[in-house]
């Protein structure tokens, strides 16, 4: 279930999040969405990829879902990482031989590569 906040009569495009089906938040618009595991659809090997990941706190789930893609290809990642998730996401990427190459200060955006 996806939820977005309504401000001034408009649905906000940033800050949407995934919640449990029974979560009911005031002032939010809700809709259901199907989520897929990336590696079940991405059949890529020995490619050069650039991926942007901005998933509002679900960074590790997404990375785990594209693990084969990340291992089998040369990638540059731009990933927004919530502060509370940074250590686990950073450790996960380092364990897969990714190196942090740049950070946008005060924006929680990090760039990694395995090239």
Labelled PLM ranges:
Residues 1-115:
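Phosphate/nucleotide-binding beta-alpha loop and adjacent structural elements of enzyme active sites
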């Amino acid at each position: 279930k996806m939820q977005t906040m309504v401000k001034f009569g408009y649905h906000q495009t940033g800050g949407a999040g995934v919640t449990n089906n029974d979560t009911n938040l005031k002032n939010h618009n809700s809709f259901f969405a199907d989520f897929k595991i990336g590696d079940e659809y991405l059949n890529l090997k020995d490619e050069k990829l650039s991926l942007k990941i901005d998933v509002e706190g679900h960074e590790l789930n997404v990375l785990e879902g594209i693990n084969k893609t990340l291992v089998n290809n040369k990638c540059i990642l731009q990933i927004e990482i919530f502060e509370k998730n940074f250590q686990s996401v950073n450790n996960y990427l380092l364990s897969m031989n990714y190196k942090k190459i740049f950070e946008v200060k005060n924006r929680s955006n990090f760039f990694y590569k395995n090239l």
